[in-house]
Curated annotation (Swiss-Prot):
This is Lon protease homolog 2, peroxisomal. Residues 693-878 form the Lon proteolytic domain. It is found in: Peroxisome matrix. ATP binds at G409, P410, P411, G412, V413, G414, K415, T416. Disulfide bonds: none annotated. A motif (Microbody targeting signal) lies at residues 885-887. The keyword Nucleotide-binding applies. Residues 72-101 are annotated as: Disordered.
Length: 887
């Protein structure tokens, strides 16, 4: 508890609107306005523990000034400070920023001196505004004699009103004071006893009763619970000890009585709850008895409710007739009969389906839709342009049967979120139907009701859950459906996605037609090949390419890092990740088309930071019991747009505990050392390609997968044998044939390539060749490895190394022609991702490079191949063939 403090003649003044700080009370405030920040810097921050400020209550100008005297502005002083002399009944009035209206600040003439127990400084991001968090302890009362404006804040000449030791000794001789003190302590002990029973606290408060003078106890107790502003002012103005004790006893007793009344109400409510629980158990027993007797009135009531619900569902006439027939059948059945439950569940489904309920479409704002797409997704310019075109057609002709969009691309490039953005732009509800791993046609069409455990298909169930007949429905992973003896889900989707047929979609469980023509379908897939051609014909494929490293870095800074920080309860005050570190993560730890692995790595860093923050004993969440105050004078220097957040500290809290609890932790900055500690050693190395092609017989190819483009190494080795070719690496038939073609072409041109001496005929005589595709657990197939295979064989047999900065793709024929291949865009992006500088492509794939970002092409040298003479570009020092040889 604070000892007597000698106050200076002048204090810096901080105004509290409709709130009073009493001596002995401890509060936490947050200062954000320029005036309060300046006050804290000048009076507290620079003076450290010696700093004192005055807390003076103020009230709104609209409130009556009769309760508290007010101050008004006077003339200037020699020191340049504006003088404001104290006179009752007047106010501080001034023109704000040259405006004609005037603001009146009603200052109370008494305040409380306070000292800072703890002071911390912070900077808000991104504004850079400086804020202070201060823990203040009220010391003693004072009277405001003169108020002055010093720069951005106020100071006041004060007169202390503290009780002296002589005054206290004299009061203790007064029988009335002794009686009041005894009565106050008795009431306080009763309050502590009640609180101790409710909250298991009060030990430290009892110590206060024995050690703190009674006149200070009065202020401390009153400050510990909520009272009105007028009562707070009354306590502040109670200079006379007997008046103060009398008022404090009254307030403490009133608080005690309110707690006791609340306890009585709580006990009464708990008694009523016990009675309700008893009635509930009896009713449950009564219901069980009625079920045994076959006389259950509750079920009859439920059936009546179901009937009313069906009547209000808005079913078409033919379906309503079917539902009535089923309802009559249900009414004739007893609840114990086997078909009762299934029939009732079926009717509940009919009643819950949105037959007429539909979302009213908002007026399409293409500009807002474009802004939404740009804010949710980075890049994807052509994809977003196609979506805007789709929305423009919907705006001009809402009932148009537009194409069904199918977003195809690697995982993590934003396919699902694009569908959600379309839903938001149209103002419709969004429902996602996952088709991954679906092999049963009944998952789409539903099970027939004759089977036990039958249920509707995923589409009807989704319509029921979303509650409207015109949602945006996402058919996610449509390429992952399979087929077995139970049917082909893709065949069932033919009816769903055909605008001519889905008007009368027939779910096997529902057994009545349902109109799906109002639903906007959007599909996603990783690759097109598994989708059956008839189903693919009903959709418009929009390909989403993988992201470049530069795009990933921008996505991480704009989207991923803020989301990860929010998910882990962090902010930039705890963790900072620079763009350079993000690029390092992309380069060393993720080589993917999308950004999911990048987000996982960022989450790992956030978790590591969360552990360090949580391990700090004093890193506690902000209290929910904060009270927010706004300055009454918006235009004055007192608090221009000021906002002060206050938290009352409980009685008896040790000041050292408060200081320790508010220590500020410096942010954790991610560097290379932290990356290795959290994410482990780098998974990828820019030198990998150079190291793997350092020996002859290795070439670098480019392949396409469902997860985007990848670099594929091809290794060849020769040994003594019988002229056989061995292939390993889990290869398909097409790629095996490409290897045979490559070997045949090399054998036919062995002399031109200087692979055999003049006169030799058989290149393979007495030796075998083994070709291996690393990553043997991954299936590989396709014709695009032809050029890569030839390069590996020529490198092996000529003992010349391939260039480490070059990768290639292309199908080849027996005559040496290089044919175009697919997936060129993803392959080029993969080469750029792996740090490759030169790419050999079929000449007829030139048109496909239009879709590759210019930032990627500017960093690559593209070499076009029409025939196999491009081999010269693949080797260091050129190809070893003879002059004038035509390949």
């Amino acid at each position: 508890m604070a000892e007597a403090v000698e106050l200076p003649s002048r204090l810096g003044i901080l105004a509290f609107r409709n709130k009073v700080l009493l001596p002995g009370a401890i509060i936490r405030i947050r200062c954000t306005s320029p005036s309060s920040v300046k006050l804290v810097e000048q009076e507290l921050w620079q003076r450290e523990e010696k700093g004192l400020i005055g807390i003076v209550p103020v009230r709104d100008a609209s409130e009556s000034a009769s309760v508290a005297p007010v101050l008004y502005p006077g003339g200037g002083t020699d020191s340049g400070e504006r003088n404001v002399k104290s006179q009752p009944g007047l106010s501080d009035s001034r023109k704000a920023d040259g405006k004609s209206q005037q603001e009146a600040v009603h200052w109370h003439t008494r305040g409380v001196a306070a000292r800072a127990l703890h002071l911390s400084r912070g900077v808000e991001k991104p504004s850079g505004r400086v804020t202070y968090t201060v823990v203040l302890e009220g010391l003693c009362r004072f009277r405001v004699m003169e108020l002055n404006s010093r720069g951005n804040y106020y100071t006041a000449r004060i007169s202390p009103l503290d009780i002296t030791k002589a005054d206290m000794e004299q009061a203790q001789q007064d029988p009335d004071f002794v009686s009041l003190a005894r009565q106050f302590k008795v009431t306080a002990v009763e309050l502590i006893s009640v609180l101790e029973q409710k909250q298991k606290t009060g030990g430290r408060t009892k110590v206060l009763l024995e050690t703190v003078p009674v006149h200070k106890l009065a202020d401390i107790f009153v400050a510990s619970f909520e009272i009105s502003f007028e009562e707070q002012l009354c306590m502040l103005d109670s200079i006379d000890l007997k008046v103060r004790l009398s008022k404090a006893t009254e307030l403490v007793d009133r608080h005690l009585q309110s707690i006791r009344v609340a306890e009585k109400i709580t006990q009464k409510v708990e008694g009523q709850l016990s009675k309700s629980q008893r009635e509930f158990l009896l009713r449950q027993q009564m219901r069980a008895i009625k079920e045994e007797l076959g006389d259950n009135d509750d079920d009859e009531d439920d059936v009546a409710v179901l009937e009313r619900k069906m009547q209000s569902a808005g079913m078409p006439a033919n379906i309503w007739k079917h539902a009535q027939r089923e309802l009559r059948r249900l009414k004739k059945m007893q609840p114990q009969q086997p078909g009762y439950s299934s029939s009732r569940v079926y009717l509940e489904l009919l009643a819950d389906l949105p037959w007429q309920n539909a979302t009213e479409e908002q007026k399409l704002d293409l500009r807002a839709a474009k802004e939404r797409l740009d804010s949710d997704h980075y890049g994807l310019v052509k994809v977003k342009q196609r979506i805007i075109e789709y929305l423009a057609v919907r705006k001009l002709k809402p009932d148009a049967r537009g194409p069904i969009l199918c977003f195809v691309g690697p995982p993590g490039v934003g396919k699902t979120s694009l569908a959600a953005s379309i839903s938001a732009a149209l103002g419709r509800k969004f429902i996602r139907i996952s088709l991954g791993g679906v092999k049963d046609e009944a998952d789409i069409r539903g099970h027939r009701r004759t089977y036990i455990g039958s249920m509707p298909g995923r589409l009807i169930d989704g319509i029921k859950r979303v509650g409207v007949s015109n949602p945006v429905m996402l058919l996610d992973e449509i390429d992952k459906t399979g087929s077995d003896v139970r049917g082909d889900p893709a065949s069932a989707l033919l009816e769903v996605l055909d605008p001519e047929q889905n008007k009368t979609f027939n779910d096997h469980y529902l057994n009545v037609p349902y109109d799906l023509s109002k639903v906007i379908f959007v599909a996603t897939a990783n690759k097109v090949q598994p989708i059956p051609p008839p189903l693919l014909d009903r959709m418009e494929v929009i390909e989403l390419p993988g992201y470049t490293p530069e795009e990933k870095a921008r996505i991480a800074m704009q989207y991923l890092i803020p989301r990860v920080m929010d998910q882990h309860g962090l902010s930039s005050e705890f963790l900072q990740i620079s763009e350079d570190m993000v690029k390092l993560i992309i380069q060393r730890y993720t080589r993917e088309a999308g950004v999911r692995n990048l987000e996982r790595n960022l989450s790992a860093l956030a978790r590591a930071a969360a552990v360090k923050v949580a391990e700090q004993d004093n890193a506690t969440a902000v209290s929910k019991d904060f009270h927010q105050f706004t300055s009454p004078v918006e235009e004055s220097r007192l608090a221009e747009g000021a906002e002060v957040e206050m938290e009352v500290i409980p009685m008896g809290v040790d000041n050292r505990e408060i200081s320790n609890a508010l220590q500020v932790m410096s942010p954790l900055i991610v560097d290379e050392t932290m990356l290795e500690n959290v994410l482990g050693p780098p998974r990828y190395d820019d030198r990998e390609t150079a190291e793997r092609v350092s020996n002859p017989g290795v070439s670098v190819g480019l392949v396409w997968t469902a997860f985007g483009g990848e670099v594929q190494f091809v290794e060849a080795s020769v040994m003594a044998g019988k002229g056989e070719l061995r292939l390993t690496g889990q290869l398909g038939d097409v790629i095996k044939e490409s290897a045979q073609i490559a070997l045949t072409w090399v054998r036919a041109r062995a002399m031109e390539l200087n692979l055999v001496a003049t006169g030799e005929i058989n290149l393979m005589e007495g030796r075998d060749i083994h070709i291996h595709f690393p990553a043997g657990a991954v299936p590989k197939d396709g014709p695009s490895a032809g050029v890569t295979l030839v390069t590996a064989l020529v490198s092996l047999l000529s003992q010349k190394r391939m260039r480490a900065d070059t990768a290639m793709t292309g199908e080849m024929t027996l005559r040496g022609l290089v044919l175009p291949v697919g997936g060129v865009k993803d392959k080029v992006l993969a080469a750029h991702r792996y740090g490759i500088k030169r790419v050999i492509l079929p000449e007829r794939n030139l048109k496909d490079l239009v879709e590759v970002p210019s930032a990627v092409l500017s960093n690559l040298e593209i070499i076009y191949a029409k025939r196999m003479e491009v081999l010269e570009q693949a080797f260091e020092g050129g190809c070893p063939w003879r002059q004038r040889a035509r390949l």
